């Protein structure tokens, strides 16, 4: 028998937990309403409702991590799925998305393939963000090489940040909607390039 414990008319969305101390795991990012009920030893019950905001922090790094070479006509990408919720009526709205990419400015094993025509070994990676319809929403290509020093960045690294505001996930002619977005590390240079780390942060309050 299915029991609608939270009284919302849906018997499949209850995550009821009982006890003085409970663990609520495997929760997708977003906004949730918690209905708390407390019963004392005399059987008297009281309750309250609170909002809980679940954000997400994803960090990827590996000493051997690299992206294959590409070019401007056929860039190489490493893609990450990024579900985003913006539901104004339900009050479940993303506040912002923060993407941070760190990579070495020059790889130790790089060889300049076009000697005499500048330093081909100077790395340049970018972050791209695509909405559910695979439309390109934003990228970091216009960030100059000497401006890639976000946060506590080592002198030998580039540290690149891309911020996506909540407005970008609304439904207008000039915005891109919510849903199943994809973010990508993007390489248009012919050389393989090492990657130090990539971070995705979804802020829900």
Predicted feature residues:
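Acidic, Ser/Thr/Pro-rich low-complexity intrinsically disordered segments
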Residues: 72-150
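Residue-level recognition of secondary-structure-to-loop junctions
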Residues: 5, 22-32
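C-terminal edge beta-strand
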Residues: 22, 44-55, 198-202
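C-terminal edge strands of extracellular/lumenal beta-sandwich accessory domains
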Residues: 42, 58, 115-134, 171-205
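Noncatalytic modules at the cell exterior or secretory-pathway interfaces
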Residues: 94-95, 147-192
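Hydrophobic/tyrosine-rich beta-strand signature of extracellular beta-sandwich/beta-rich modules
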Residues: 36-38
């Amino acid at each position: 028998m299915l029991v609608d414990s939270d009284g919302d008319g849906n018997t499949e969305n209850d995550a009821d937990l009982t006890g003085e101390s409970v663990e609520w795991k495997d929760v997708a990012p977003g906004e949730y309403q918690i209905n708390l009920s407390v019963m004392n030893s005399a059987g008297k019950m009281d309750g309250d409702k609170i909002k809980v905001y679940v954000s997400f922090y994803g960090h990827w790094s590996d000493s051997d991590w690299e992206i294959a070479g590409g070019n401007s006509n056929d860039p190489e990408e490493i893609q990450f799925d990024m579900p985003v919720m913006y539901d104004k009526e339900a009050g479940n709205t993303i506040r912002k998305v923060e993407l941070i990419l760190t990579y070495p400015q020059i790889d130790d094993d790089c060889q300049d393939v076009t000697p005499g025509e500048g330093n081909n070994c100077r790395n340049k990676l970018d972050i791209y963000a695509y909405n559910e319809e695979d439309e390109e929403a934003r990228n970091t290509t216009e960030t100059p090489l000497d401006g890639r020093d976000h946060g506590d960045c080592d002198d030998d690294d580039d540290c690149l940040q891309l911020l996506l505001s909540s407005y970008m996930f609304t439904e207008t002619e000039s915005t891109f909607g919510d849903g199943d977005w994809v973010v990508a590390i993007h390489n248009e240079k012919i050389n393989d390039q090492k990657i130090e780390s990539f971070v995705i942060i979804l802020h829900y309050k």
